[in-house]
């Protein structure tokens, strides 16, 4: 095959739809900030220049996704999207690579009218023993639950686990460790009365090599295995109902988690008979990092790596609004007759299952979100997601996405901004606010939130504070406080932003860094103790006098 290499990267896509932005003045943004009580989630998106609040559901979908969306049907029971979506999950997370994919959606795309073929290859296929039962097995032992987004999947999981534990051990308090619980996961764990713990290597996270570049990704998102086993032994395995890993590790600056660490965490959890749960919102980005940086995976496809990652988990939650490359969707699943099922189902003395935990989850799904055919999603969104999951297996797409993250992070670093977390994560860039402010702002100042609000006020750039304010530093125990990363995240929306957007952000942050002494602190006016307070608390800025 002939090649004529260039220094410039080869384009792999076109942009066919454009949204124009209004000209918004600083005074107009100030008025809106005051009206919305300085809550970044309440600020009107239509007044922003660059929105980097979240990469969740903000994806610019592909032409194949939009065409699939038009094939969706809205039948209340067992619409086509139900079958197609579950089989897309099987393709990627169970079948070991593209060569083994069934691509069930092609039956719908081609307008198949052969009813026997549809029954044999789509509607009535039996699957059991994995993460996505099908046919009669899914009705008898439901283990895969379509839900409209990740936090809803977490909520269903935690509510059912809480109910079962409360019935078995009234009044008992449990601990649930992770390499890093995100804000919604932590909030759901707290609301079930349990204690979340984040076990990672904080010292490694803040290390930056000379010049800011790593030859290989150091997998800073890894679970600290020593801390995990120490915690399990300290509180007792019987008091740890679940062990989590977040891949990539969103609260720890979107850092990658190695396959070796996923496997080792699974082994430790299983050593103590504890189910291992994966938070897999950014599974494809994590698979990319493994492919590019971990020995033995360089020749494997993203889908092959994903299958192995998921093989180590007993259950998983997923916000498919991230690496589902879609605007809506989620999933909760556990391994058929696996450890999660065994630990949370009821059995008689002879070992026969008397009540299946999957049935309990299904009842919750139906009562809160919709029947198991759609779980709160529209049929057309399910079709778009089925395609989007496979779009995320495209290496060229992932390579360009990670390159955008690296460009932004290196742009900050080269501009002299302190506190940039390197290497960049897979979905955005994080700046440590303690270093940014030269260690001069106390935890009670919520200066990271002040930075986020000032960036919005001056330049129309919305980011997400994920530090002292959002992670509720002031409400935590000293042990938990030590596990908080005091950071602000610049999330990069999938397939949406151009280099012009990133250059604008780099210049704005560079200018704000030079004037950091004049960035205000923030105080919480109301909602300090509300669960996940950053979504609904009222704040106000005040001048920094230190």
Predicted region positions:
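PLP-dependent enzyme catalytic core of the Aspartate aminotransferase-like
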Residues: 167-168, 392, 458, 470-546
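Short, conserved charged micro-motifs
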Residues: 248, 438-447, 495-504
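Short amphipathic alpha-helical segments
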Residues: 328, 369, 427, 485-493
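Short beta-strand-to-loop capping motifs
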Residues: 334, 431-434, 492-494
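Conserved PLP-enzyme active-site core in the AAT-like
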Residues: 2-37, 53-55, 65, 77-84, ...
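A short, surface-exposed helix-loop junction/capping segment
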Residues: 63-71
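A structural motif shared across PLP-dependent enzymes of the aminotransferase-like
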Residues: 42-63, 75-87, 473-476
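Conserved small-domain helix->loop->beta segment predominantly found in fold-type I
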Residues: 373-453, 457-484, 520-530
């Amino acid at each position: 095959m002939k090649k004529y290499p260039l220094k410039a990267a080869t384009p792999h896509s076109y942009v066919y739809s454009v949204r124009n932005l209004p000209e918004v003045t600083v005074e107009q943004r100030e008025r809106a900030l005051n009206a919305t009580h300085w809550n970044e989630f309440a600020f009107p998106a239509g007044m922003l220049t660059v929105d980097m609040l979240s990469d969740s559901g903000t994806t610019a979908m592909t032409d194949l996704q939009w065409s699939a969306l038009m094939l969706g049907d809205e039948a209340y029971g067992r619409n086509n999207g139900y079958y197609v979506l579950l089989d897309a999950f099987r393709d990627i997370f169970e079948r070991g690579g593209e060569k083994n994919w069934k691509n069930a959606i092609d039956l719908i795309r081609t307008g198949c009218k052969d009813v026997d073929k549809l029954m044999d290859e789509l509607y009535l296929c039996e699957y059991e023993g994995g993460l996505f039962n099908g046919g009669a097995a899914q009705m008898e032992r439901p283990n895969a639950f379509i839900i409209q987004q990740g936090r809803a999947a977490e909520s269903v999981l935690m509510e059912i686990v809480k109910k079962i534990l409360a019935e078995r051990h009234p009044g008992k308090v449990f601990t649930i460790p992770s390499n890093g619980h995100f804000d919604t996961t932590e909030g759901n764990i707290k609301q079930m009365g349990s204690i979340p713990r984040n076990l990672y290597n904080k010292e490694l996270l803040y290390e930056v090599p000379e010049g800011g570049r790593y030859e290989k990704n150091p997998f800073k998102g890894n679970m600290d295995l020593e801390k995990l086993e120490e915690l399990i032994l300290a509180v007792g395995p019987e008091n740890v109902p679940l062990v989590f890993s977040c891949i990539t590790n969103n609260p720890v600056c979107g850092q990658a988690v190695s396959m070796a660490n996923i496997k080792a965490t699974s082994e430790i959890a299983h050593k103590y008979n504890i189910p291992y749960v994966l938070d897999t919102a950014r599974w494809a980005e994590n698979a990319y990092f493994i492919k590019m940086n971990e020995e033995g995976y360089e020749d494997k496809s993203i889908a092959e790596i994903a299958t192995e990652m998921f093989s180590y988990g007993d259950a998983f939650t997923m916000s498919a609004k991230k690496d589902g490359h879609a605007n809506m969707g989620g999933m909760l699943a556990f391994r058929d007759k696996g450890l999660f099922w065994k630990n949370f189902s009821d059995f008689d003395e002879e070992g026969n299952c008397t009540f299946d935990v999957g049935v309990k989850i299904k009842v919750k799904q139906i009562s809160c979100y919709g029947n198991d055919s759609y779980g709160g999603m529209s049929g057309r969104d399910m079709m778009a997601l089925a395609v989007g999951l496979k779009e995320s297996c495209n290496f060229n797409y992932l390579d360009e996405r990670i390159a955008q993250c690296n460009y932004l992070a290196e742009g900050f670093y080269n501009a002299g901004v302190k506190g940039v977390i390197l290497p960049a994560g897979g979905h955005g860039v994080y700046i440590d606010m303690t270093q940014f402010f030269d260690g001069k702002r106390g935890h009670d100042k919520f200066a990271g939130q002040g930075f986020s609000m000032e960036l919005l006020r001056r330049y129309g750039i919305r980011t997400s504070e994920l530090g002292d304010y959002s992670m509720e530093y002031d409400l935590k125990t000293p042990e938990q406080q030590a596990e908080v990363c005091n950071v602000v995240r610049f999330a990069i929306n999938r397939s949406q932003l151009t280099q012009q957007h990133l250059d604008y952000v780099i210049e704005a942050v560079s200018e704000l860094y030079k004037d950091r002494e004049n960035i205000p602190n923030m105080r919480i006016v109301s909602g300090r103790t509300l669960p996940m307070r950053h979504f609904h608390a009222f704040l106000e800025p005040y001048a920094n006098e230190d």
